[in-house]
Curated annotation (Swiss-Prot):
GO terms for cellular component: cytoplasm. This is Elongation factor G. Catalyzes the GTP-dependent ribosomal translocation step during translation elongation. During this step, the ribosome changes from the pre-translocational (PRE) to the post-translocational (POST) state as the newly formed A-site-bound peptidyl-tRNA and P-site-bound deacylated tRNA move to the P and E sites, respectively. Catalyzes the coordinated movement of the two tRNA molecules, the mRNA and conformational changes in the ribosome. It comes from Orientia tsutsugamushi (strain Boryong) (Rickettsia tsutsugamushi). GTP binds at residues 17-24, 95-99, 149-152.
Amino acid sequence: MSENHKLSYVRNIGIGAHIDAGKTTTTERILYYTGVSYSIGEVHDGTTVMDYMKQERDRGITIQSAATTCHWIKKDDCAEQASQKEQEYKINIIDTPGHVDFTIEVGRALRVLDGMIAVFDGVAGVEPQSETVWRQADKYAVPRICFVNKMDRIGADFFRCVQMMKDRLGTKPLVIQLPIGIEDTFKGVIDLVKMKAIVWSNEDLGAKYEYHSIPSNMHAMVEDYRHQLLETVVEVDEEIFNSYVSNEDLSEADIRKCIRKGAISGLFVPVLCGSAFKNKGVQTLLDAVVDYLPSPNDVNSIKAVDVKTEQEISRKVSVDEQFSALAFKVINDPFVGSLTFIRIYSGKLQTGSTVINTTKNQKERISRMLLMHANNRKDIKEAVAGDIVALTGLKSTTTGDTICSLDSQIILEKIEFPKPVIELAVEPKTPADQEKISAALVKLAAEDPSLVFTVDSETNQMVIKGMGELHLEIIIDRMKEEFKVEANVGAPRVAYRETITQSYTVDYTHKKQTGGAGQFARVKIIFEPLEVGAGFQFESKIVGGAIPKEFIPGVEKGLEEIKESGVVAGYPTIDFKATLIDGSFHEVDSSVLAFEIAAKNAFKEGITKAGPKLLGPIMKVEVISPNEYMGDIIGDLNSRSGVIQSMEPRGNTQIINAYVPLGQMFGYVSTLRSLSQGRAQYSMVFSHYEQVSRSIAEKIQAKDKK
């Protein structure tokens, strides 16, 4: 079998969802049924394979994306399939966090994966982080299948969950399984492709399951959903469509072919159900992974930039192409040091070879290559297109970098990282901890690009910035556990931003004469607001040599640096454009540095007069509460400047959706616990930046002046 043909039996998938929807439990069952694990780990016992960090086992949540490889031989009683030789599929799985503070782990995993299992809580349905993960998958056009989990739980409602997928995710769910029973009577599923019931044994940890005829009380419903299934899927294949409208019977293989085609193209999303904790539905989920999610061969050619020509090119995902890969994660392993996870897009990679990091123009030697199973590892000598492996000892490579062969150098599309929304001041408990803190943060930031740390040049105070309170709490924990560094931690602070609301043109001259060589630079810059999310843009419209082109990078550099300290309260300035339209220079006294200084002073003057405003992060908050506490909870959200968007009943509880400034949400978990006697719960995700009220802006400016 050729290497490229083997690729058709590889699946690179992620498992993602809202916290507590059952992602890690589902993954643990997959590892058990595929023979990777000989016992089933449980989140509540702290014995899971995929959650291997101490903080993960202590808290019962997934923090880092753990990678593992398993193999699956599909069990099939379909005559067309059974006559063929059984084929083993290689499945590379990345289990991602569901907590909003670790969204970056989800994003960078999706960037290198070909497909995703979206796990939904059968009781809660589509939750806020489910939406966030879904939008990230949309961004990278990752094909998905859905698994409605926890069908054994009180309040589980498969059909409500499917409707929520339509309403909240804007997707087209394709139901390919129906639950048999509900809550404590749930015992299996109806397979709408085979038109058979599948029932799991309560013994052998669900390893055995049998096919039965469809229960008589479900015939009408099954026929209805089967009709909907066929009407949807035949649209993707003209030949099969013609057979269908001619009333010819469609084979299972035909139906699967159509589902696969539609799922990979994103026309619809197959929906399955089960209970991972009760060991029901996982084997059929694995079958769906190999049937309906793409192999590397199904992925379109990758886009890249040729280093020599700087032109955009495409490269086939093939073993026959030159080697290229993207580094999507770096971790520090206590036994082997730095581990760099890569997804190989083309060609082959052998240990002992030399490659080039084209992002940084640095050569790297591949001394050791590992297949990872959570924190266990297996040495390998060669990896090929489609593989996800870990490399040890890379000196220059960090997350988002491209590595490729020396003979054909390209740069792949980078991974985008979210900006921090919260910060903490940290200081060493003892002078001896000062250097250790810096060293620890350098290593942690290399692993996690959403972690940023800075040192105030005036106070020498160190500030760490991240995606939420839990994110920074975990960082402090890891500094203590892994690096033996004790730190005093300040109260959390919001990472505000600044922007402008109107255009303003500045004509600024920087002139300095101190005997000897002087400094001279004149710049004329238009500062204008941009739409939300546009960031910073610089454009030069200099013509006729008013400013020599070698000095223009100095203007851009000056603006890039100064925009990080805005004029309102010292926060980064975003969503504006600076257009250099004129200027002048001196033959002797002008320099790149002089134009850098001129640009910085022009920024201070121009932004001050362009209607500067302070922006704060707004969070989308979902609160689930028993009816009797609704009044107090809504009153509290209103007192936090919250805007209630909707309220919807769910059994004897209510779901409140609101937008609330992050600065008003610190310590909310304690307040909510007190208001509801511990019975309500909440989750929140970052939504957008919004102008803060005048009173809050004045408070922040007053703090800044102290």
